[in-house]
UniProtKB/Swiss-Prot annotation:
Name the record gives this protein: Envelope glycoprotein N
Quaternary assembly: Interacts (via N-terminus) with gM (via N-terminus). The gM-gN heterodimer forms the gCII complex.
Locations listed in the record: Virion membrane; Host membrane; Host Golgi apparatus, Host trans-Golgi network
Main location class: virion
Gene giving rise to this polypeptide: gN
Membrane-side (Virion surface) residue stretches: 30-47
Provenance organism: Human herpesvirus 7 (strain JI)
Function per UniProt: Envelope glycoprotein necessary for proper maturation of gM and modulation of its membrane fusion activity. Also plays a critical role in virion morphogenesis.
Membrane-related topology note: Single-pass type I membrane protein
HAMAP family cross-referenced by the UniProt entry: HSV_GN
Taxonomy, superkingdom: Viruses
Residues exposed to the Intravirion side: 69-86
Lineage: Viruses, Duplodnaviria, Heunggongvirae, Peploviricota, Herviviricetes
Signal sequence bounds: 1-29
Keyword annotations from UniProtKB, A to Z: Disulfide bond, Host Golgi apparatus, Host membrane, Membrane, Signal, Transmembrane, Transmembrane helix, Viral envelope protein, Virion
Membrane-spanning ranges: 48-68
Length: 86
């Protein structure tokens, strides 16, 4: 077995796979988008998906860390200003 035969089989399989992929421009609900009843400026939040739960957890962690930082920073500034007078 030559190196060409070993390497060429996966490459041929990948080429076959990528040439068989069909790309479409269809979007779900596209026919309703241009109708007057469509409200494209509203977005329905679905909390059943993993990504939406994950972003809520990340937002909560970010807000908690930001509040702890501000609490520390304000306490540090208050203590520094209080001690400065003595």
């Amino acid at each position: 077995m030559t190196l060409y035969k070993i390497v060429s089989k996966p490459i041929i399989l990948l080429a076959f796979f990528f040439t068989r992929v069909v790309f479409t421009n269809e979007v779900d609900g596209e026919e309703l988008f241009y109708k007057p009843t469509c409200h494209s400026d509203t977005y329905e939040i679905i909390l059943k998906k993993f990504s939406s739960i994950w972003i809520l957890v990340n937002t909560f962690i970010l807000l908690c860390s930001f509040s702890l930082f501000l609490k520390y920073w304000c306490f540090k500034t208050l203590a520094k200003e209080t001690v400065k007078g003595y």
